């Protein structure tokens, strides 16, 4: 007989921080990830953490910028929590050994990014912030005696008994599947980028968390709001698309068309530093009418400030000091997700969520640059503390976990269904992308239903992705307005409502 422990699904910044917080509260924890610990979108983050630490800045100013970027949909209280608790989380990261970039005076170097009114972005290793932070937290998690790590172990479904989630059915890389009983399950599975043909997300970002939550009746919110990063390196057929960080534009790079015209200025007076949804649409228009390029030739210290991007560009025979960089938008981030309260509880008892998979209300219709890692830290911390408190207040009898014959096995049907997924990605990009309409969304719904009908029943991974694609499409069709990351050609921007689809 074993006492059930909290199970955390995912090892991005939200998953690792939740595990560390629970363990620091004395709570033994299990962390499950379908690949290795380092395989997450967090580890790929080139941008930094937005936090109000500089002179003339404040959490209230950071909150104002966040609310302005959200296009009227962010929850002011969630945003207040995000920006006011952020500095404490950064200081905790420093105490754990994280090393952020500093200036000659020894102070944290603060960068400027789109739609921020103050320089407040801290970086680690120039453009390798995510890798540096995940490396630090991974070491903490691997060494902690209260944290058990199950790598290369896939969560097939949530175990839902009675009125609550009580565990996860898992499928290891080798061996039989089994049920892992849990005192609570925390989803920290990241985003949905692999539902699209062009994305900056790693291949593990297959919308698992949304599908798992939906299957047990947890509410999803604002899933129609998807952010397309304006400056992915344009390399047709490459998945994932290499990212050229927002920080490059913050350092002075310009967006130009084939004539050298700064087209972003025609969309918004802030030009390259306008909110991402505006810049992405401007880049898409330029790309469709001759091409869009990022001109970083004026950044003399580019290789020193952006070593990772410099190396990536060199692999594609581009030198940012001499060449224009061809760019195009790519699916980057999901603003909505599993609806949670401000402590990470979903609408289904026993199920929690943190990070990109969750909808806390901090992003609204459009995320402010570099608020994603911050959200992962702040709300994972709140979830860990609240869950530890809840577990101390309750007493549950030991239960046993073991093999369960109903767990899906890997029959190879998903591999055989790859052509279906490829068609789904192209369909979503063409019809549920930066520009949508009633006609495109209806077409996508019909085609996704057809693809689901053509998919073998035992291809459960494929069915989960098709399910989430249909949910996103339906939510987008029901939201009859244009706002933030959701733009409909048949509903031009006008008076905005607060209701969500």
Residues of each region from the PLM?
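Short beta-strand to alpha-helix junction loop
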Residues: 74-87, 121-139, 150, 199-207, ...
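Glycine- and aromatic-enriched mobile tails/lids
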Residues: 1-5, 21, 25-27, 36-37, ...
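Short hydrophobic core segments
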Residues: 7-9, 180-189
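Conserved N-terminal glycine-rich FAD pyrophosphate-binding loop of Rossmann-like flavoproteins
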Residues: 35-67, 71, 238
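N-terminal Rossmann-fold NAD(P) dinucleotide-binding loop
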Residues: 15
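An anion/pyrophosphate-binding glycine-rich loop and adjacent beta-alpha core
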Residues: 37, 212, 218-325, 386-392
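Glycine-rich loop(s) and the adjacent beta-strand/alpha-helix scaffold that form part
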Residues: 184-238, 242, 371-379
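Conserved redox-cofactor binding core of oxidoreductases
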Residues: 95-177, 188, 232-235
């Amino acid at each position: 007989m074993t006492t059930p422990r909290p199970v955390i699904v995912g090892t991005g910044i939200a998953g690792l921080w939740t595990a560390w917080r629970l363990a620091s509260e004395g709570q033994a924890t299990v962390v499950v990830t379908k690949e290795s610990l380092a395989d997450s979108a967090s580890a790929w983050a080139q941008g930094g953490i937005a936090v109000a630490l500089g002179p003339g800045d404040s959490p209230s100013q950071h909150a104002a910028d966040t609310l302005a970027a959200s296009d009227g949909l962010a929850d002011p209280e969630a945003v207040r929590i995000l920006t006011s608790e952020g500095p404490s989380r950064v200081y905790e990261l420093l105490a754990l050994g994280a090393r952020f970039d500093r200036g000659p005076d020894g102070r944290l170097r603060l960068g400027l990014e789109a739609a921020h009114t103050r320089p407040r972005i801290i970086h680690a290793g120039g453009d390798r912030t995510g890798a540096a932070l995940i490396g630090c937290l991974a070491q903490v998690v691997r060494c902690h005696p209260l944290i058990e790590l199950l790598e290369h172990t896939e969560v097939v479904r949530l175990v839902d008994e009675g009125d609550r989630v009580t565990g996860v059915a898992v499928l290891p890389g080798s061996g039989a599947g089994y049920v892992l009983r849990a005192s609570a399950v925390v989803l920290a599975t990241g985003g949905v980028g692999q539902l699209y043909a062009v994305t900056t997300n790693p291949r593990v970002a297959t919308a698992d968390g949304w599908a798992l939550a939906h299957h047990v009746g947890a509410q999803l919110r604002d899933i129609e709001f998807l952010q397309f990063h304006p400056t992915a390196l344009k390399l047709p057929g490459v998945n994932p698309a290499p990212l050229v960080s927002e920080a490059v534009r913050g350092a002075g790079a310009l967006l130009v068309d084939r004539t050298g015209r700064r087209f972003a200025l025609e969309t918004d007076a802030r030009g390259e530093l306008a909110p991402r949804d505006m810049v992405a649409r401007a880049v898409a228009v330029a790309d469709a009418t001759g091409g869009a390029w990022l001109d970083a030739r004026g950044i003399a210290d580019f290789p020193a400030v952006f070593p990772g991007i410099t190396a990536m560009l060199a692999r594609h025979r581009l030198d940012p000091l001499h060449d224009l960089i061809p760019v195009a938008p790519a699916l980057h981030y999901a603003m909505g997700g599993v609806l949670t309260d401000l402590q990470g509880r979903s609408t289904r008892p026993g199920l929690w969520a943190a990070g990109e998979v969750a909808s806390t209300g901090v992003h609204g219709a459009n995320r402010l640059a570099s608020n994603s890692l911050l959200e992962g830290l702040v709300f994972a911390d709140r979830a860990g503390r609240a869950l530890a408190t809840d577990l101390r207040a309750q007493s549950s009898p030991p239960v046993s976990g073991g093999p369960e014959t109903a767990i899906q096995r890997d029959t190879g049907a998903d591999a055989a269904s790859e052509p279906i997924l490829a068609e789904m990605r192209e369909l979503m990009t063409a019809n549920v992308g930066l520009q949508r309409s009633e006609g495109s969304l209806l077409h996508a719904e019909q085609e996704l239903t057809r693809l689901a009908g053509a998919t073998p029943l035992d291809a459960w991974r494929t069915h989960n992705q098709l399910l989430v694609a249909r949910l996103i499409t339906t939510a987008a069709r029901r939201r009859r307005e244009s706002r933030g990351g959701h733009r409909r050609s048949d509903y031009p921007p006008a008076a905005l409502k607060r209701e969500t689809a």
